[in-house]
Amino acid sequence: MKILKKVLALSVISLSLSTFSLSANADCGKARLADFDWSSANIHTAIVAFILEHGYGCEVEVTKGSTTPIMAAHYDGQLDIVTELWYDNIIANYDPVEAAGVIRNLGINTPDSQQAFYVDRTTADKYDLKSVLDMNNPEIAALFTDPEDPSKGRMTSCISGWTCYTVNYVKQRVYGLDNFYTNFDPGSGGALDAAIA
């Protein structure tokens, strides 16, 4: 009898929540989501789109593009939701718009995501590479020869058009690495994944 009461109570609670949810869903309308051309953004956008469509009955429209035009559309109110972005790449544009209350940051969905120049542990240990400045050496650059420009090493960068491509280009110049390395554009997110795997 106790089990039956628990099941009945849970059913009533579930039914009331469903009723509340259904009445809330009626006013959902259209949700305009942004998506980018990298895998983690794709999965985050797909999950949010699924929840909005199937959980709240929203009509979902997804617009895919690169950071600059997508964020400009978001700032202008043409897009409602951006599920993932690389904040460090857009601070100068993002902060004033957020401070003005035009957009709201709801938190971090992928903690500890970092942008940096990486070298595998074996190579770093063997050549005592502890800082990006240790890469500023022609003998070290020769370890990473760029097949398209054998006079330099290759630093695999982001895709041309991604903000981080420009960030990496500037970092190479500031650190003096452009004398020894190319800022290699792998051409696609999949090729970038393969290059760093």
Residue ranges and their predicted role:
Residues 9-19:
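Bacterial N-terminal signal peptides
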